[in-house]
């Protein structure tokens, strides 16, 4: 684990408030200095860069969460494809084929914008084939149990018959056919909600998103209102048709961004932490 202090505090940043995944080239932090030393000593044939991914990501063209996303990171600003990057692509294609048997259309391809301070981009620039794994959301699996299973399947399939890592003509095409992952999900969307805005009744949609909060060494999911209206391009992992019922929260009849998603509809139907409970 590169960032034990950050893992303990449930944050990307280390004890010096530095995001280590933006420190690969500069190596200003002791953790990154140590990783660089280990890299030089070990001289790996491949690097696997494992991350979690937020629930907001889905696969482009499909109304499905991006449960696992991959990337063969770029080695230059033009995002060209060289032999090093193609070796990573061969492995990604192998993992994608394995996962399609379990979670079809829920495998995404991460954005390949180049930043040499990102760990994967740095190692690719150093001519080591590198694969980024992003473990995302599976339907109603907020504890990521299913996601971990599919990461394991990915890792196992990448290691089987790895001696056959031969680059054939259609490898790049197959890689680029993996749908781009994009920001298209909220944890909750509430549709057809009546509000009163400046004494005018309106029907709107609004969304809530979980904040992951560390309390007493436990992670708690706290739903907060995150977007009001303009949700045509988004889907919810959970969606409610509120059938023109009136929103109310402590006497206020309009949802406010940043407030906890605890409210009533028609003063009768209760939502607590985003979820309908009555």
Predicted feature residues:
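Active-site/substrate-binding loop(s) of hydrolase catalytic cores
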Residues: 1-105, 124
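C-terminal accessory segments enriched in acidic
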Residues: 42, 71-79, 85, 90-278
């Amino acid at each position: 684990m590169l960032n034990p202090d950050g893992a303990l505090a449930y944050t990307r940043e280390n004890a010096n408030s530095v995001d280590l995944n933006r420190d690969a080239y500069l190596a200003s932090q002791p953790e990154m200095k140590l990783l660089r030393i280990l890299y030089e000593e070990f001289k790996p044939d491949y690097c696997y860069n494992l991350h979690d991914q937020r629930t907001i990501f889905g696969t482009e063209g499909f109304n499905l969460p991006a449960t696992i996303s991959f990337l063969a990171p770029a080695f230059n600003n033009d995002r060209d494809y060289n032999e090093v990057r193609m070796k990573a692509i061969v492995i990604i294609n192998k993992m994608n084929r394995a996962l399609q048997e379990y979670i079809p259309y829920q495998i995404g391809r991460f954005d390949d914008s180049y930043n040499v301070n990102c760990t994967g981009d740095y190692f690719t620039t150093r001519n080591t084939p590198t694969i980024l794994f992003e473990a995302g959301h599976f339907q109603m699996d907020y504890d990521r149990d299913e996601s971990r299973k599919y990461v394991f399947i990915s890792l196992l399939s990448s290691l089987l018959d790895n001696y056959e890592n031969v680059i054939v003509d259609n490898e790049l095409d197959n890689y680029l056919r993996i749908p781009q992952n994009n920001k298209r999900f909220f944890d909750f969307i509430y549709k057809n909600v009546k509000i009163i805005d400046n004494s005018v009744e309106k029907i709107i949609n609004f969304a809530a998103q979980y904040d992951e909060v560390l309390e007493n060494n436990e992670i708690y999911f706290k739903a907060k209102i995150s977007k009001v209206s303009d949700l045509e391009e988004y889907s919810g992992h959970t969606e409610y048709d509120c059938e023109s019922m009136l929103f109310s929260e402590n006497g206020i009849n309009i949802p406010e961004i940043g407030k906890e998603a605890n409210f009533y509809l028609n003063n009768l139907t209760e939502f607590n932490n985003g979820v309908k409970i009555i």
